[in-house]
Amino acid sequence: MQRVTVLCVGKLKEKFYIDAAAEYVKRLQRSCKLDIVELPEYRLPEDPSPAEIQKALQAEGAAIRERLPKGGAVVALCIEGKLCSSEELSRRMADFGVQGKTQITFLIGGSVGLSEDVKKLADWRLSMSPMTFPHHMARIMLLEQLYRAYQIAAGTKYHK
């Protein structure tokens, strides 16, 4: 069984995000060993300067690197990442397993994204969409796509 870690900056606060995440975590338990790690989000002022943004990226990046599991595949969610279909995500996850990478870690940055240093650690950069979404919603979207990917691999009727 694959081990999947979702390493994310920021804590879910809104009930609808918490409920959605809990539902997908429950569904995913049959397909993988899932661990969600929430890291503190660096507090930024309302209109941060480029230096303040850089400081936040560095602080959040250090926290990510500290908690990053050793070995396995690393996937960074970022706007410049590769767009892919649900079927392709399913294939990529299976390919990681064939390569002996039974641990897959997905990285979700905070409101200012991921530092370039963190992105360089990734085996694959994935974009959920060319549109911009709140990072909390990106977590829900990722969890749904992980569930869908495992259902595709299992040949169930969930994915149409």
Residue ranges and their predicted role:
Residues 12, 79-82, 110-113:
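Short glycine-rich anion-binding loops that position phosphate/pyrophosphate groups of nucleotides
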Residues 40-104:
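S-adenosyl-L-methionine/SAH cofactor-binding core of RNA-modifying enzymes
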